[in-house]
Swiss-Prot record:
Keywords: Activator, DNA-binding, Nucleus, Stress response, Transcription, Transcription regulation. CDD domains: AP2. Its main location: nucleus. The gene is DREB1A. This is Dehydration-responsive element-binding protein 1A. Residues 170-182 have a biased composition (Acidic residues).
Length: 238
């Protein structure tokens, strides 16, 4: 069990970690040497492959965070259980920034999981006990994810408002209805003809054609215009 860590600072315990720690160039897990593989061979590896201070807990997909307190051999600070690996990784960063700012880490740069944690996480610059650090870390991580959700909701609202749908006018609806009527008229005429033929019956149709072929041609006594020719006029009169 870690003892009480007394830290005195001119800043109030609630002020965020600003210029002193934010201006330092902190290392990250992407620039620091890779993590050494676990020495345990008989147990399943639960540590996160990239993030520091993060390991899996059980089969429910939850993650826990626990950090080593710099300068205090064998002392670890438990930070809690989180739903995502990023939440546990952010808690690690907040704890390291708070301990470093208070002088527990020697005042130098610490290794973070995310480089932007140095200015996105509001952590105290001084603390009296490690319990204060744990409480400040929980508030910093909760505030970080609350601001992220608010930003995502704002961006989604702005993107939906910048692309309004074009309203349909009455002229567009009338032209669309007219085009539909014109395009459907040839098809309706063809359907009408097919319906007439089907109602007559193909047998009756061909029978009427045969009957017309058996009819005698009109009499030659009628002219082309239907008037009767009164006398036969010879073609040659000599």
């Amino acid at each position: 069990m870690c003892g009480i860590k007394q830290e005195m600072s001119g800043e109030s315990s609630g002020s965020p970690c600003s210029s002193a720690s934010a201006e330092r160039q902190h290392q990250t897990v992407w620039t620091a040497p890779p993590k050494r593989p676990a020495g345990r061979t008989k147990f399943r590896e639960t540590r996160h492959p990239v993030f520091r201070g993060v390991r899996r807990r059980g089969n429910a997909g939850r993650w826990v965070c626990e950090v080593r307190v710099p300068g205090r051999r064998g002392c670890r600070l438990w930070l809690g259980t989180f739903d995502t690996a990023e939440g546990a990784a952010r808690a690690h960063d907040a704890a390291m920034l708070a301990i470093n700012a208070g002088g527990g880490g020697g005042g130098g740069a610490c290794c973070l999981n995310f480089a932007d944690s140095a200015w996105l996480l509001a952590v105290p610059r001084s603390y009296r006990t490690l319990a204060d650090v744990r409480h400040a870390v929980a508030e910093a991580v909760e505030d970080f994810f609350r601001r992220r959700l608010a930003d995502d909701a704002l961006s989604a609202t702005s993107s939906s408002s910048t692309t309004p749908s074009t309203p349909r006018t009455d002229d567009d609806e009338e032209s669309a209805a007219t085009d539909g009527d014109e395009s459907s008229s040839p098809a309706s005429d063809l359907a009408f003809e097919l319906d007439v033929l089907s109602d007559m019956g193909w047998d009756l149709y061909y029978a009427s054609l045969a009957q017309g072929m058996l009819m005698e041609p009109p009499s030659a006594a009628l002219g082309d215009d239907g008037d009767a020719i009164l006398a036969d006029v010879p073609l040659w009169s000599y």
